[in-house]
């Protein structure tokens, strides 16, 4: 399966039990910042934004004082899983980032999608990729 198919079929799909509800943007990005696949709506990010995200995975809490920035949008960092998942909130939406062995899986959402549903979609694919050694 291509990386784009993972984004299209597993991240940007209707959320289980909620027909028509889906993430607003998603991507799979290598830990070096190279985009493997992304939705058309995924924001163009700056290298320093990706560096900040990678630093937070290696030094949990790094982004808490400044917030998580992606494509110029600032998210307030909320409880995640140290070294594995970063979660952010902005207004009625937010972001979930799951780290795998080689990549980062991004999901961005707005209401009516809930933080929990975004976490489920992103982390399920991230866990699958981890199981595959990716």
Curated annotation (Swiss-Prot):
Note: The variability of the residues taking part of IgE-binding epitopes might be responsible of the difference in cross-reactivity among olive pollen cultivars, and between distantly related pollen species, leading to a variable range of allergy reactions among atopic patients.
Protein family (similarity comment): Belongs to the profilin family.
Assembly information from the UniProt record: Occurs in many kinds of cells as a complex with monomeric actin in a 1:1 ratio.
Organism: Olea europaea
Record protein name field: Profilin-4
Disulphide linkage map: 13-118
Subcellular compartments: Cytoplasm, Cytoskeleton
Recorded coiled-coil stretches: none
């Amino acid at each position: 399966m291509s990386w784009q198919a993972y984004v299209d079929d597993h991240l940007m799909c209707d959320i289980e039990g909620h027909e028509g509800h889906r993430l607003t943007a998603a991507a799979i990005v290598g830990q070096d910042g190279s985009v493997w696949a992304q939705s058309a709506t995924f924001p163009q990010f700056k290298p320093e934004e990706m560096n900040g995200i990678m630093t937070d995975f290696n030094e949990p809490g790094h982004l808490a004082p400044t917030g998580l920035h992606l494509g110029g949008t600032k998210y307030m960092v909320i409880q995640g899983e140290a070294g594995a998942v970063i979660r952010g909130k902005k207004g009625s939406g937010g972001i979930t980032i799951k780290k795998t062995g080689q990549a980062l899986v991004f999901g961005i959402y707005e209401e009516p999608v809930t933080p929990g549903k975004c976490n489920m979609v992103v982390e399920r694919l991230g866990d699958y990729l981890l199981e595959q050694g990716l």
